[in-house]
Amino acid sequence: MRVGIIGAGSIGLLFAAYLSRVFDVTVYTRSQEQSAEINQHNVLLQSGTEETIAKVKALPIADWQGSEALTIIAVKQYQLFSIIERLSQLPSMPENILFLQNGMGHLKLLDGINTNNLFVGSVEHGALKENPYTVRHNGIGTTNVAVYKGDPGFLKMFVSSVSNVFPITYQEEYFAMMEKKLIANAMINPLTAILQVNNGALIDNPFYYKVLQNLFSEITAILNLEHPEEYWEHVIKICKKTRDNRSSMLKDIEAKRLTEVDAILGYLLEEANKQGKKFPQLETLYYLIKGIESQGVVI
């Protein structure tokens, strides 16, 4: 089966490296230079002390025709607008599309896509792009996937096909799955980005831990969570499991890139606004990240 991956950042390269063990994978890059590098070197996957080379074809995004059986969209949420516009210009709409963005702000964009099967996923792996063709897998987790619209048959087949090489878990209900990841993103990403610390510091430092608790109280109120303890335990588990990792938002800030704060905290603040309520700690974090972004972001 042919799989196309749109985006060659850390997650795009990680998926390309593992899925190439089962499928014929083409990764579509933003620049001609990166696709040339991948075609010359293939994708180098680093995991622990091991290095493996994955045979992957690369093309610039301008050459994307959407002809693969599965298309995986692995770009940042704020880059989706141009990708969705490109979708409408393809000779034929891809039949199966999997979106792998953080937050939930992008879900409203999916309703305008006219295709048979739309899937969404939440990635719990830690990955770092070392150079245009090298990715380090520094936190092994899973990828949860669910049907946003369409038939689950194809997605279940895909999950079973890769289960021996890359952990992907099928979930029955997309909203609960995305909400769980949103909560973790909203608590871990902004704090680590502002404090410039690894994930584990949020639970190791008692003062940071208190801020984490306060944030969770606000998020619980916005989302009206029925069993908040389950979500809290999930966040703590992630902090423990990825204690030495730097969050994606922190890495974006360090690289002077735009973050996905609008898809994460922006989404929560929109929900709060619908309720006519103010949540000052979340709002403060949102404006702090936007302020950092405004200081000379390079996209």
Model-derived segments and spans:
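NAD(P)+-binding Rossmann beta1-loop-alpha1 motif at the extreme N-terminus of oxidoreductases
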Residues: 1-53
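Rossmann-fold dinucleotide-binding core
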Residues: 100-177
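Helix-loop-beta segment of a Rossmann-like dinucleotide-binding subdomain
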Residues: 134-144, 196-202, 245-255
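NAD(P)-dependent Rossmann-like dehydrogenase/reductase catalytic/cofactor-binding core
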Residues: 213-299
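Rossmann-like NAD(P)(H) cofactor-binding subdomain of soluble oxidoreductases
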Residues: 46-134
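Active-site-proximal catalytic alpha-helix in oxidoreductases
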Residues: 175-203, 207-220
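Short, well-ordered alpha-helices that flank and scaffold nucleotide-derived cofactor binding pockets
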Residues: 17-21, 85-89, 108-112, 266, ...
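Hydrophobic anchor at the start of a short beta-strand
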Residues: 3, 25-26, 97, 118, ...
